[in-house]
Amino acid sequence: MAPAMEEIRQAQRAEGPAAVLAIGTSTPPNALYQADYPDYYFRITKSEHLTELKEKFKRMCDKSMIKKRYMYLTEEILKENPNICAFMAPSLDARQDIVVTEVPKLAKEAAVRAIKEWGHPKSRITHLIFCTTSGIDMPGADYQLTRLLGLRPSVNRFMLYQQGCFAGGTVLRLAKDLAENNAGARVLVVCSEITAVTFRGPSESHLDSLVGQALFGDGAAAIIVGSDPDSATERPLFQLVSASQTILPESEGAIDGHLREIGLTFHLLKDVPGLISKNIQKCLLDAFKPLGVHDWNSIFWIAHPGGPAILDQVEIKLGLKAEKLAASRNVLAEYGNMSSACVLFILDEMRRRSAEAGQATTGEGLEWGVLFGFGPGLTVETIVLRSVPIAGAE
């Protein structure tokens, strides 16, 4: 007698919740220090005659709370591609030529580190999720990474282009569904971002573009996600408890990006921090209602640091203690805003800080946590996390 459909479906699914099993990160070698960046930026874009605008940009950089960023674009590359340095010059071909090659290469570095920490052969990877806002190509960056890593040709690939800063949450939401609905699945998730698509010279009439030039940096992060980990050989870092996405009310046009002949342009409204802080309480209440959690200082925080104003207003609105957003602020300071990759860097920062401080769990000694992605839409991704005990912790 043929097995019942329900039995077949049950056998296809994992038993337990999805968990992050390993994390790896990577940046280009070229580090740019924020204190020196205004002079460098206005010199390389031949804009030093715009003295008042340069002073505004210096103030933006000073207020950014960023110490340094990493960028693939070096002075040599920019000198060879002067149209990238202009504000409105046709330059998409030159930008595309860079990112379609370099985005998968940077992704490979992060993925190799994640796979090494995981400790299993790459042949066990069943699914690949690749996310980037940097360039579009066919076959995509997911295909290129599959070839670079030597993954099985039958790996199930998912390519997410042009999502923006919320997408670090999106990939976790998708990975959770894949891991929990496919028994034995091991999902490699990679976010790789290179600002070669958005770098451009200054304009006195487009200060929102200048804000982006003060904030964005390059980086790639990779994680392995799976359910029912092998207790002998796999070490979970965080469980993915729930995941949801929402579009904030009255936020249309708050963050826009448009791919044009001049590259990818970003447009930001000043009230983005206000829109997020106004709505974040509802996102938290909806996410944590099943757990009965209402004290936002009793959970650990991984919030996308779009800029310091977003973190500041969230902190004030929710009455968070200063240390709650320390991991997010530290990643912003050391790397800048790396779009989709940022929250995965913060996830890595969280587990490292917790271990180094001798905390009992990967979430600063706390059990429950939240990961937030904010981006175009205005879209918010909310992931509820559960930490795991750190071996040997008191």
Swiss-Prot record:
Statement: the UniProt record of this protein carries the keyword Flavoprotein: no
PANTHER family: CHALCONE SYNTHASE, HYDROXYMETHYLGLUTARYL-COA SYNTHASE
Broad EC category: transferase
Catalytic activity annotation: (E)-4-coumaroyl-CoA + 3 malonyl-CoA + 3 H(+) = 2',4,4',6'-tetrahydroxychalcone + 3 CO2 + 4 CoA
InterPro entries the record matches: Chalcone/stilbene_synt_C, Chalcone/stilbene_synt_N, Chalcone/stilbene_synthase_AS, Polyketide_synthase_type-III, Thiolase-like
Name this protein carries in UniProt: Chalcone synthase 3
Pfam families with a match to the protein in the record: Chal_sti_synt_C (PF02797), Chal_sti_synt_N (PF00195)
GO biological process: flavonoid biosynthetic process; polyketide biosynthetic process
EC number of the protein: 2.3.1.74
Family: Belongs to the thiolase-like superfamily. Chalcone/stilbene synthases family.
Keywords of this entry: Acyltransferase, Flavonoid biosynthesis, Transferase
Function: The primary product of this enzyme is 4,2',4',6'-tetrahydroxychalcone (also termed naringenin-chalcone or chalcone) which can under specific conditions spontaneously isomerize into naringenin.
Pathway given in the UniProt record: Secondary metabolite biosynthesis; flavonoid biosynthesis
Gene Ontology molecular function terms on file: naringenin-chalcone synthase activity
Domain of life: Eukaryota
Active site positions, chain numbering: C165
Source organism of this protein record: Bromheadia finlaysoniana (Orchid)
